[in-house]
Amino acid sequence: MRVAIAEAELARGSTGNNPWVGCAIVSPQGELLGRGHTLGPGEDHAEIAAARDASARGFTVVGATLYSTLEPCSFHGRTPACASSIAARGVARVVIGMRDPHPRVDGEGIRILREAGVLVHEGVCEPEVRRQLGGWVIEQHPYEPIHRAQALPQPQRVALLAELYGVAPSRIEALLAHRS
């Protein structure tokens, strides 16, 4: 996932209204087969760029593990759905940093992958990925953090707000108590 996170940084500022996503594809033996990041609007998303990189290096991704900082997209927009493409290429396992908050994705990419028999792990390095994509989430999906926080039990909500604002949980608890 660290390679994918580094790849995502290469895309920051060049993806239009798309998120800056990074991807790495690794063989069952742990060899890096390909890496990529989201290109400009209408161009390859990170997962496809990484698969093309693997192919250009002479590797197949059948049976490989794909690491992506964000859940692969599930709908055909300017580009085909990445989740379907990943499954069709024979990737065995997908490791995701965080779910895509886009209303047309949010878990749908994961569902497509699982229905195709791909093993999916979510939440790997999620705090780091959330911080990395924070600007995009706020810009493109401004209410997503609020909706997610409201759904959490009080202790988890306090921990989340403390992390987001970089303050001690006791300060958040005091603010919430003062507001009541």
Locate predicted features.
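Short loop/turn motifs at secondary-structure junctions and domain boundaries
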Residues: 13-17
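Catalytic-loop motifs flanking and including active-site residues across diverse enzymes
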Residues: 46-47, 82
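Mobile, glycine- and charge-enriched loop segments
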Residues: 48-76
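A short acidic/small-residue loop/turn micro-motif
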Residues: 38-42
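Short beta-strand scaffold segments in enzyme catalytic cores
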Residues: 20-30
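Zinc-dependent deaminase
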Residues: 1-12, 77-180
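Cofactor-binding loop segments of dinucleotide-utilizing enzymes, especially the Rossmann-like FAD-
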Residues: 28, 71, 99
